[in-house]
Structures are given as structure tokens and as C-alpha cells.
């Protein structure tokens, strides 16, 4: 059965991916999951420099489930490009890199580094706190989201997915601010 899909001009063999943050870059699960069967791997967030993440405990049981607060622990873009991208390239799956940052210049530094890497898409995590916006989630302001997205689209050579925060009264305002810059990026 053909389950292929085209997402932003990228042909996937199937529409199955893992959510960012749940799968690392796949190495942790390679002995348990056939990565070749996934349409894509969406990596854990990567920043311009390594982040230690939150102190432990990071997971707590709550009524009806559990909560976690990992804090976007990651190795930083340099080690990610050196170690994680080559690991993922050995598999027959698309690579979506989740990009995180505290400020626009941090996001842009990671996007610039990834632009020439052999990846298929970028997912920009704009629900991270932003030091330049009074510690509000960057993705809660339509103007900030639109401005950052436009800057990223000028640099990225891969399609860009904006990971919107659900922590807003009306997410449609944020989404609508991106419509005029939503055309796929294509660089020669």
C-alpha cells in the first residue's frame, strides 16, 4: 500500500513521525524501533549552544497522567551537526530538526548553521521563553512570530514549520500572521 505524502514539497514514504523531544535524535531508540519505517524523525530541540536543561526531578505523576519539565536539554548545534545528523543519515527517513532558542538571534544562528546541512525540514519551536520579550513565550505575540519567521525564511534552504504555542487565547491570530510568508522556501 502506498502511504507516501508530500509535505511542503518533501516526499515522505508515510506520514508517521515522532514528536520532538520524545525520541532524542533516534540513537537512544535504535535498538527498539526500526527508524527506517518512519516517514520522518523530528529531533529533540537543538540550540546554538549546549543547554543543561532543568534540574531534577524532571518528571512528576499527576492525576490522570504525568508532567515533565526537561528544559530543552541539548548538545548544541555544533555537536548535533557532528554527531546526530550523520547518525540519522544512515536511515531511510526524512530529518526534521527542531530549533529552539531564548532570543531571535539564537534561533537565527541555528537556522544559519542548518541551512547547508543534509536535513529535510526545520521545526522552529517558538513556545520557548524569550529573554528579549520579558520572559513571555516568544510565540504568544503575532508580531514577534511574523518577524522571526520572515527572518528565518530568508536564511533557511529547507521548508520551515513553525511550532506554535497553545498557550494563547486565540491561536488563529498567530497562524494568520504567517499566511503571507508561508510559501515554501526554495534556494538553488
What is the role of each PLM region?
Residues 1-95, 101:
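N-terminal capping/small domains of soluble enzymes
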Residues 5, 81-89, 115, 149-156, ...:
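Surface-exposed amphipathic alpha-helices with a cationic face
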Residues 21-23, 98-109, 161-177:
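Active-site glycine- and acidic-residue-rich loops that bind
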Residues 47-52, 126-138:
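Conserved radical SAM core fold
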Residues 77-81, 131-152, 168-170:
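Active-site-adjacent beta->alpha loops and helix N-cap segments on the catalytic face
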Residues 179-183, 187-188:
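Single conserved hydrophobic/aromatic residue that forms the stacking wall/gate
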